[in-house]
Regions:
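Active-site helical microenvironments for divalent-metal-assisted chemistry
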Residues: 1-253, 257-306
Length: 306
């Protein structure tokens, strides 16, 4: 927390942890660990991955107290603040929402309802963090619970994370959901990706260095990041387009981050000069942003070795 917010209310955060530990005393998670390890992990996600404020971290530590203990909105309001109490109560209300339909129209209505119920956007952010930690520790639940929660996550929480521009969380939520919705398919893709990663490690490093060098020559200040596509995006492409993994050519992605819109287009020109672009695969999300206001340029190119 100190790294991004040196003036955070550390005394209040510590007090919230002590309050949560006292109220969850005697409660355990499915793996046998003290229950308080869960709100602590959620607070860690809120702080380290989302860089939210003190009130959000405190509310994350307390997010299950109204739902699962004798803590009250009034008491939390007095001990911490009315805003923290409202955040905790907001998360509790979202927790009580039940998912009964698999119809896409009903799912979309439910997503809209959850967004509307969260009068403060931080409620949704804490709830997504809560779901992310639960998915990270889902192996201790029954197979039935695993599939139920994974379906909810895939259909409700991952799309909301996408709308809020939380791409990394969206990807992880999707991958963790796939792990339980189709264990065999997930495992096959993970094993194949591990093989591809070992096979193409040198290739990715070479491309990274080529791009970095050309941008430096052009005087463009940029950060170049390389990654393999995440398992669910590959799974979806394989099953919706009836392809094998060997038929999915865009397994790797490079992200180039620059400071200006002009440099985005300059970088695109350099990339297309270095590698052959595939027709019909260019998307301009700067000129036409996505509904969540995501802006970037996307292109698919063919490397020197194909």
């Amino acid at each position: 927390v100190k790294s991004y917010n040196p003036s955070a209310g550390f005394d209040q955060i510590h007090a919230a942890y002590e309050y949560a530990a006292a109220h969850h005393a005697g409660q355990n998670r499915k793996d046998g660990s003290p229950f308080v390890t869960h709100p602590l992990a959620v607070a860690q996600i809120v702080a380290e991955e989302l860089h939210l404020d003190t009130e959000s971290i405190v509310a994350a530590l307390l997010h299950d107290t109204i739902e699962d203990t004798d803590a009250t909105h009034e008491e939390i309001s007095k001990l911490f603040s009315p805003t923290v109490a409202d955040l905790v109560e907001g998360v509790s209300k979202l927790t009580r929402v039940h998912y009964t339909s698999k119809e896409e129209e009903q799912m979309e209505n439910l997503r809209k309802m959850l967004m509307a119920m969260a009068k403060d956007i931080r409620v949704i952010l804490i709830k997504i963090s809560d779901r992310l930690h639960n998915m990270r520790t889902m192996e201790y639940q029954t197979p039935e619970k695993q599939k139920q929660k994974s379906f909810e996550t895939m259909e409700i929480y991952a799309p909301i994370a996408h709308r809020l521009g939380m791409q990394r969380m969206k990807w992880e939520l999707e991958d963790l959901s796939l792990k339980y919705l189709d264990p065999v398919g997930y495992r096959e893709i993970i094993e194949a990706l591990d093989e591809k990663a070992a096979e193409y490690d040198g290739f990715m490093s070479s491309v990274h260095d080529q791009i970095t060098s050309r941008l430096r020559e052009a005087g463009i200040d940029a950060t170049v990041q390389a990654r393999m596509k995440h398992p669910y995006s590959i799974y979806r492409k394989m099953y919706t387009q009836n392809k094998s993994l060997d038929d999915v050519f865009d397994l790797f992605a490079f992200r180039v981050i620059v400071g200006t819109v002009a440099d985005c287009y300059n970088v695109l020109g350099i990339i297309h000069d270095l590698y052959k672009p595939i027709l019909g695969r260019f998307k301009d999300y700067i000129g036409t942003p996505k509904p969540n206001m995501y802006q970037s340029l996307h292109t698919t190119v063919v490397g020197e070795s194909g």
